[in-house]
C-alpha cells in the first residue's frame, strides 16, 4: 500500500495516490 503525501488523496479503488486538486 502506497503512502499519500500531504495534498494527495487516496484512490481506494486502485490503491494508489493522486494529486488532491
UniProtKB/Swiss-Prot annotation:
InterPro entries: Pacifastin_dom_sf (IPR036201). Residues 1-21 form the Pacifastin domain. Expressed in hemolymph. It is found in: Secreted. Keywords: Protease inhibitor, Secreted, Serine protease inhibitor. Residues 1-21 are annotated as: Disordered. It comes from the Eukaryota. GO terms for cellular component: extracellular region. GO terms for molecular function: serine-type endopeptidase inhibitor activity. Belongs to the protease inhibitor I19 family. Probable serine protease inhibitor. This is Serine protease inhibitor 1. It comes from Melanoplus sanguinipes.
